[in-house]
């Protein structure tokens, strides 16, 4: 992908994302699993590229993300890294690869060697010691709270989280504990918009929403969902950005623009308590 290199384009860093949050500029994030789409997302101004374990669904045809292995994540991270020039590259720690802080470090180090600049892991305040352990060893962390797909069986399915007073209070505790442990980014999935706004307001780090309303610091979607090439029923928070667009590039640019101007997510993509 050397033909895409442009020395005038500035690299997106964690401090850059923090500055965007403080300035009120929305952050656009999308998934990618190969070098071609990675290069296209980067070229279209996507600030954060996520190598998600969602590859289990959209690349491997799995029903859940649970079968995805660390080896799968390393391979796809390497591919995405080769296509990316400026976006911040985040990779998921897959199911079963962070049972202890020490094991989490081994897994995260493998992803960092493959080209990740930050790792994402799913869980609440119980993960704070692991996050602290990673951050102290120079591994930036994005935490993922709310609906955590790796916990699909424990949660009883893909359900909106934080709908009761008790679960909403726990989500707030989770977010604060993970920030205090050193997380520099938090993804909130399938959370009522009002609750996500409250969590965002109580934190000093950026939040990225997926089905969490417009008041998060930014938004993320699975690429195959937003360009409408993944068959089957779509989640409520998905919008088909290919509609009315002449190309995938145009759809990605439309997504970035909609995130930036706050028109996505709209009310129809949002959950209420």
Swiss-Prot record:
Reactions catalysed, as given in the entry: 3-methyl-2-oxobutanoate + (6R)-5,10-methylene-5,6,7,8-tetrahydrofolate + H2O = 2-dehydropantoate + (6S)-5,6,7,8-tetrahydrofolate
Record-listed Mg(2+) binding positions: 53, 92, 122
Q: Describe the family membership recorded for this protein in Swiss-Prot or TrEMBL.
A: Belongs to the PanB family.
Pathway(s) per entry: Cofactor biosynthesis; (R)-pantothenate biosynthesis; (R)-pantoate from 3-methyl-2-oxobutanoate: step 1/2
Q: Name one GO molecular function term.
A: magnesium ion binding
**Which HAMAP family does its entry note?**
PanB (MF_00156)
- What does this protein need as cofactor? Mg(2+)
Q: What is its EC number?
A: 2.1.2.11
What are the recorded Gene Ontology BP terms? pantothenate biosynthetic process
Q: What is the lineage of its organism?
A: Bacteria, Pseudomonadati, Pseudomonadota, Betaproteobacteria, Burkholderiales
Name listed for the protein in its UniProt record? 3-methyl-2-oxobutanoate hydroxymethyltransferase
* List of catalytic residues: 189
Instruction: Respond yes or no to whether keyword Magnesium is given for this record.
Output: yes
Chief subcellular location equals: cytoplasm
Q: What class of enzyme is it?
A: transferase
- The protein's role, per its UniProt record: Catalyzes the reversible reaction in which hydroxymethyl group from 5,10-methylenetetrahydrofolate is transferred onto alpha-ketoisovalerate to form ketopantoate.
Amino-acid positions noted as binding 3-methyl-2-oxobutanoate in the UniProt annotation, renumbered to this chain: 53-54, 92, 120
- Has the keyword Cytoplasm been applied to this entry? yes
Q: Which Pfam families match?
A: Pantoate_transf
Provide this UniProt record's keywords sorted from A to Z.
Cytoplasm, Magnesium, Metal-binding, Pantothenate biosynthesis, Transferase
Cellular compartments annotated: Cytoplasm
